[in-house]
């Protein structure tokens, strides 16, 4: 994928296709969202041709990112002759600054890469591990039977920075330091606070420490909309990463300062835990569905769950049922429960625990599993298909959190990247280190303390991860599309709904993202957008689903992004979900 600079196109020659971002309520407050009136009675076969945003098409390159400033940074890289990996790194650096509660250099990342010249697909696991002190006995001595969802004990080693550097070393073409310049500039000199960002800060900032409150909620309120938000300490840290790479973060002053800060707060990370961290190039998982080959991350992520969901869907005639009919929605919801029961029982770090991926993806097994769906009644509890039920407790301090950013780019040489990075929950652990400006994630909260569970905490172990970027190829092996979304547990659910909108119901990428969605939660709890017809909602209730009908367009249902390539013309169509602040640009 490394490609020398071949093309320089002036920004003045480009008319950016930008659309306003819809404001949305936060998914962390699902239970507090009011019930609203559903859509009027309309034919169940309605195709959602109307859309909030235009289709964004280009013939040379495209980007889609979780914030317009990030998308613009990625576009500039592509137009300056950089490739898709260069663009993703630049966008990641900007998002670490302008969406600080959702991601940053204190969090984790994963990426899938397509080489336009060779057709090679590679996957990078840039998630961090528990420290050497993180034994079950350590937590038992603290009187805990569950790892806290925030605070110092929820912090595992941040992996994002190593991921940026490793991705650049393998595929990047521009100078690494140059790629972080825009993010550093926004951190040092400020960026304008949006309405959505101010709302996020106020609704998610309750667990912030004093340094975090001083920066993001001064005087107990978010910075005024339109004001400039600066984090000069973070700018300094990003500059160290830009000039010193991984060593500057994991072996230098940043690691020493962060480990000291975590120790002061009562956490378990020490300098050697940072120094020992590595990313890993891993073999992605592949599965066929709807005449495409889908590429996902292997465990420790829930990518295996995505492929299982696709495989089980083959046993039901979803197209005949009709998009967003009661039968269609009920089937997908019940299949999700089956897939998640296996996920919660088995998905963990395969370097430290047995994860039976071949059995979880066995076609005969999944065909039989899919037959367990009762079309008349929603299942309240679903057991895993194999393994002791007693060991199938949810992993760690699981919540419906989904405070993540997704990034994707396709360049003029046909290279494509699907990248995701996250703090896990809003503001992560709630711990902002004033000296470095780094907010630490809380991904370590997803370990369990249950004896014998594959995801039981252990030194040097990676926790189970919800992060699940995806890529699809045409049958001839050529790139088809990237797709990803924030949303925690809803990521796999959102991806199958969008995929079927695109491939089964012939929607454009933007239509596929904007169509009404559901989010199955614990038990029979179901968040669903009010653009679903009232007749369908009544039928779902009659089958036992406990509905929370939510007004669109809220962040409860993720914030998906996609870049699709037309196999006949090569035209790229980039899409960005209006439910959050995502932006798509193509040229």
Regions found by a protein language model. Name each.
Residues 1-9:
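Bacterial N-terminal signal peptides that target proteins for export
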Residues 17-20:
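C-terminal motif of bacterial Sec signal peptides marking the signal peptidase cleavage site
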Residues 22-24:
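Bacterial signal peptide processing site
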Residues 26-72, 76, 84-245, 249-251, ...:
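Noncatalytic scaffold domains of N-terminal-nucleophile
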Residues 41, 315-422, 436, 443, ...:
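Internal maturation/activation junctions in enzymes
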Residues 97-123, 268-270, 415-481, 505, ...:
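Active-site rim segments in enzyme catalytic domains, especially the processed small/beta chain
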Residues 281, 401-404, 465-467:
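Short, small/polar residue-rich loop motifs at catalytic or cofactor-binding pockets
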Residues 461, 495, 504-555:
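Extended C-terminal subregions enriched in glycine
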């Amino acid at each position: 994928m490394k490609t020398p600079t071949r093309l320089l196109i002036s920004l003045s020659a480009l008319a950016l296709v930008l659309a306003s971002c819809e404001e949305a309520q936060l998914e962390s407050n699902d239970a507090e969202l009011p019930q609203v009136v559903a859509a009027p009675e309309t034919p169940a076969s309605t195709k959602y041709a109307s859309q909030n945003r235009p289709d964004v098409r280009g013939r040379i390159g495209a980007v889609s990112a979780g914030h317009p400033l990030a998308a613009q940074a990625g576009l500039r890289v592509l137009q300056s002759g950089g490739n898709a990996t260069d663009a993703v790194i630049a966008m990641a650096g900007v998002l670490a600054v302008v969406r600080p509660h959702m991601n940053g250099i204190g969090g984790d990342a994963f990426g899938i890469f397509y080489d336009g010249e060779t057709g090679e697909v590679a996957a990078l696991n840039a998630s961090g591990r528990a420290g050497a002190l993180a034994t079950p006995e350590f937590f038992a001595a603290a009187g805990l039977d569950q790892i806290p969802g925030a605070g110092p004990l929820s912090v595992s080693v941040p992996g994002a920075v190593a991921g940026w550097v490793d991705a650049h070393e393998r595929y990047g073409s521009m100078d690494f330091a140059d790629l972080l310049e825009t993010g550093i500039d926004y951190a040092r000199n400020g960026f304008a606070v949006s309405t959505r960002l101010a709302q996020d800060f106020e609704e998610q900032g309750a667990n912030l420490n004093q340094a975090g409150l001083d920066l993001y909620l001064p005087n107990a309120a978010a910075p005024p909309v339109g004001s400039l938000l600066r984090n000069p300490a973070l700018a300094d840290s990003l500059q160290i990463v830009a000039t010193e790479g991984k060593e500057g973060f994991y072996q230098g002053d940043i690691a020493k300062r962060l480990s000291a800060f975590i120790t002061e707060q009562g956490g378990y990370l020490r300098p050697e835990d940072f120094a020992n961290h590595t990313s890993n190039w891993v073999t992605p998982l592949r599965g066929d569905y709807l005449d495409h080959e889908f590429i996902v991350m292997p465990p420790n992520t829930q990518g295996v769950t995505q492929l299982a969901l696709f495989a089980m869907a083959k046993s039901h005639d979803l197209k005949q049922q009709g998009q967003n009919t009661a039968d269609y929605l009920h089937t997908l919801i019940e299949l999700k429960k089956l897939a998640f029961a296996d996920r919660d029982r088995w998905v963990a770090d395969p370097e430290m625990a047995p994860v039976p991926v071949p059995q979880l993806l066995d076609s005969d097994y999944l065909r039989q599993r899919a037959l367990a769906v009762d079309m008349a009644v929603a299942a309240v509890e679903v057991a895993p298909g194999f393994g002791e039920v007693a060991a199938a407790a949810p992993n760690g301090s699981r919540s419906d959190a989904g405070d993540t950013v997704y990034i994707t780019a396709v360049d003029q040489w046909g290279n494509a990247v699907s990248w995701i990075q996250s703090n896990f929950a809003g503001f992560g652990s709630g711990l902002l280190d004033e000296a470095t400006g780094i907010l630490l994630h809380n991904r370590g909260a997803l370990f369990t303390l249950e004896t014998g569970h594959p995801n039981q905490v252990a030194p040097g172990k990676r926790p189970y991860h919800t992060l699940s970027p995806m890529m699809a190829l045409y049958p001839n092996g050529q790139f088809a599309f990237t797709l990803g979304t924030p949303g925690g547990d809803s990521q796999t659910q959102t991806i199958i709904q969008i995929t079927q909108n695109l491939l089964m119901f012939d929607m454009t990428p933007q239509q596929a993202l904007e169509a009404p969605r559901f989010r199955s939660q614990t038990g029979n709890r179901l968040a669903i957008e009010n653009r679903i017809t009232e007749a369908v909602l009544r039928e779902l209730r009659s089958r036992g689903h406990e509905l929370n009908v939510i007004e669109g367009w809220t962040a409860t249902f993720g914030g998906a992004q996609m870049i699709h390539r037309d196999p006949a013309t090569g035209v790229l169509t980039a899409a960005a979900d209006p439910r959050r602040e995502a932006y798509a640009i193509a040229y």
